[in-house]
UniProtKB/Swiss-Prot annotation:
TPR repeats lie at residues 51-89, 90-135, 136-171, 172-208, 244-277, 278-333, 334-364, 365-403, 404-445. IFN-induced antiviral protein which inhibits expression of viral messenger RNAs lacking 2'-O-methylation of the 5' cap. The ribose 2'-O-methylation would provide a molecular signature to distinguish between self and non-self mRNAs by the host during viral infection. Viruses evolved several ways to evade this restriction system such as encoding their own 2'-O-methylase for their mRNAs or by stealing host cap containing the 2'-O-methylation (cap snatching mechanism). Binds AU-rich viral RNAs, with or without 5' triphosphorylation, RNA-binding is required for antiviral activity. It comes from Mus musculus (Mouse). It is found in: Cytoplasm; Endoplasmic reticulum. This is Interferon-induced protein with tetratricopeptide repeats 2. Domain-swapped homodimer. Component of an interferon-dependent multiprotein complex, at least composed of IFIT1, IFIT2 and IFIT3. Interacts with IFIT1 and IFIT3. Interacts with STING1/MITA and disrupts its interaction with MAVS or TBK1. Interacts with EIF3C.
Length: 472
């Protein structure tokens, strides 16, 4: 193929609406992270999205240099389109054909790439456009792809489904996608609007169990219609007790309403289908960890000799969290939660190992602060290493993000400093801590006449093994 012909081919390929032109992988995201998020998170694991998932998988296979495998995935996508959309095969196949054209282009098989471009062109010409048309089915497919693949494009997703609804306002699939996009946007626009959109989607798709559970979660979040929320979840589970995305969201609902036993029951069902899914093991571990802390809060149970039950729960939590960590090492909080459980079990070497592992991760500011708070507490209370506790509290305060953990670390540092000054007015480390607090956003000056300083002198940092991510 001549240079001019190749440039023309590329120009036409760029006009296609398909996964190769939608910029689905964020610039700061690795292919491994992208693939894990797309194929292991809980949304859209069910049969109605098989064609969509095959197209996404084909794109991932190509990115990994597995073009033959990509072609096989596209062939499977064509088969699912014919099964699920027999009345719209041509329109629904445009994205798949576009992906075919791009894969063959990258394989150097330009004639085959052109053949698929021609197939797209034949359909688009019916709408007076060479390679790109405005069609609600295409907007819908782009919306599902972005909803599944992207992290921060929910506004763009909403626009895709909104465009589709302008042409077909009562379409159940478009309405469901639009409602899910609003759910993802969470607090903006107002939650009542999100609830309205989910209710509208259910009216048009009464069998959509996933949307029912999303509505239940939203109703619970705004603290209204608790009975309706519970009824929606039970109805969804009765209608389709094996749908993975419904099971996982329902488990999340039961966690939020403090029914961890029911959540664990649903997660066990999910594990039967996804035995090596890190996220399901992680959620299971978190549920068992929640039961551990609930039992610890009921101190009379521990003191009355029910230590064996506590140890069993700790081991179940550890087993699932370790399994999750083995499958996917970068899960947020997994190592911190393991460290927490080992502290409760008084296995401090194991706890320190997982704290160190978590510290080695590249965490966002909020989780990093929380980690320094937890590790500082561990050093102060369990290891009796005040120097190391001070170091980690300071490291957490240095992170320029106002959070509850940061506030707690300031308070802990101030109490440590004031207590030391109460014992020795010239304690250089205590004076250094107070100067550090002043330099990093304020703190109490070393003033021996300060009533607050005297009152604080005999206090120590408060201990909390269960200082969770909800704090920041």
């Amino acid at each position: 193929m001549s240079t001019t012909s190749k440039e023309s081919l590329v120009c036409n390929l760029r006009q296609l609406k398909c996964h190769f032109t939608w910029n689905l992988i964020a610039e700061d995201e690795s292919l491994d992270e992208f693939e894990d998020r797309v194929f292991n998170k809980d949304e859209f694991q069910n049969s109605e999205f098989k064609a969509t998932m095959c197209n996404i998988l084909a794109y991932v296979k190509h990115c990994r240099g597995l073009n033959e495998a990509a072609l096989q995935c596209l062939g499977e996508a064509e088969g699912f389109i014919q099964q699920q959309h027999p009345d719209q095969v041509e329109i629904r196949s445009l994205v798949t054909w576009g992906n075919y054209a791009w894969v063959y282009y990258h394989m150097g098989q330009f004639s085959k790439a052109q053949a698929y471009l021609d197939k797209v062109k034949q359909v688009c010409k019916k709408f007076s456009s060479p390679y790109r048309i405005e069609n609600p089915a295409l907007d819908c497919e782009e919306g599902w792809a972005r909803l599944k693949c992207t992290k921060n494009q929910n506004e763009r997703v909403k626009v895709c489904f909104q465009k589709a609804l302008e042409k077909d306002p009562k379409n159940p699939e478009f309405t469901s996608g639009w409602a899910i996009a609003f759910y993802r946007l969470d607090d903006w626009p107002a939650r009542n609007y999100c609830i309205d959109s989910l209710e509208q989607a259910i009216q048009l798709s009464p069998d959509n169990t996933y949307v029912k559970v999303l509505l239940a979660l939203k109703l619970d979040a705004v603290h209204v219609h608790k009975n309706q929320a519970m009824a929606l979840v039970e109805e969804a589970l009765k209608k389709d007790p094996s749908a993975i995305d419904t099971l996982l969201r329902a488990a999340r609902f039961y966690c939020k309403v403090y029914d961890t036993d029911r959540a664990i029951q649903l997660l066990r069902k999910a594990l039967e289908k996804l035995p090596n899914n890190a996220y399901v093991h992680y959620y299971m571990g978190c549920c068992y960890r929640s039961k551990v802390h609930h039992m610890l809060n009921r101190r009379e149970m521990v003191f009355s000799g029910d230590r064996k039950k506590l140890e069993e729960l700790i081991q179940l939590a550890v087993n699932h969290l370790r399994k999750a960590e083995e499958i996917k090492e970068m899960l947020e909080y997994s190592c911190s939660f393991l460290a927490d459980l080992y502290i409760i079990a008084k296995k401090y070497d194991e706890a320190d190992y997982y704290f160190q592992k978590e510290l080695s991760k590249d965490l966002p500011p909020g989780p990093k602060q929380l980690l320094h708070l937890r590790y500082g507490n561990f050093q102060f209370f369990q290891m009796k290493r005040q120097d190391k506790a001070i170091y980690h509290y300071m490291e957490g305060v240095k992170i320029k993000k106002k959070t509850i953990p940061q506030k707690k670390m300031r308070e802990k540092l101030q109490r440590i400093a004031l207590r030391r000054l109460h014992e020795d007015e010239s304690d250089s480390e205590a004076l250094h801590i107070l100067a550090f607090l002043q330099e990093n956003g304020g703190g109490q000056q070393a003033d021996k006449d300060s009533e607050r300083g005297v009152d604080s002198a005999n206090q120590v940092p408060s201990a909390s093994l269960d200082e969770d991510g909800a704090e920041y």
